């Protein structure tokens, strides 16, 4: 990983569960709830479109804790099974499939599908990761297609491809903004061709060019870096912005992000089940 509301009460992205309000946020919020009817199947060719202000949970560390009472889960596509996705659907949740698109990871089951020639510099701070040469669409497209196929077969509603702003990093390759646009649009098309919605992860510089290609955004730390205003094209287009802060406390960012329409919460950097929504 890279490794950030419309004021409608029914969709308050900054609403917290009883356990969040009562405690200091040290444990996963919410208790197991009675199963709700599964979401109705979308009309033919219609993708799920999350709306601004929709509450969410983001857990990439291990198997998902399915007890958190929110309508959207974003979980690791490799670490979670079709049964987990089905359980969340039975509770009325929509489920996003996380995978790393911009970097190779030495712990993934498809690691040998990446030729050595597309592996670049280490992704500093993330053990076992190396940037990939996003210019090599001929090599990466079938690998990404296979990952998105995995998400579709497991029943996910959407995908979150991570590290989609490599051109702003020291990847070991001379990547350009146009290289990044082509790669990101390839990811969006692969998802849409399979009936899945797709998130634009961070990549604030290219939001004006890509807001029409992506169905929602996932952002880390826009409040910490004073960048949340740059996400408003998604909100104006009626598309959710799922946002987290790691170092700031909710009282330091919620008033701003609620006003802008973001679905915000504080998470630990390890992205376990713990959360403190606005």
Which functions belong to the PLM regions below?
Residues 56, 71-75, 95-99, 159-161, ...:
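Hydrophobic faces of well-ordered beta-strands that scaffold small-molecule active sites
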Residues 99-160, 164-229:
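Chitinase-like catalytic core of GlcNAc-active glycosidases
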Residues 42-129, 134-135:
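N-terminal carbohydrate-binding/catalytic regions of secreted carbohydrate-active enzymes
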Residues 2, 8-47:
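N-terminal low-complexity, Pro/Thr-rich disordered segments
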Residues 14, 234-235:
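Extended, hydrophobic alpha-helical segments
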Residues 79-90, 178-179, 226-234:
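Active-site-adjacent beta->alpha loops and helix N-cap segments on the catalytic face
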Residues 52-61, 218-227, 235, 240-278:
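C-terminal active-site rim and adjoining tail of enzyme catalytic domains
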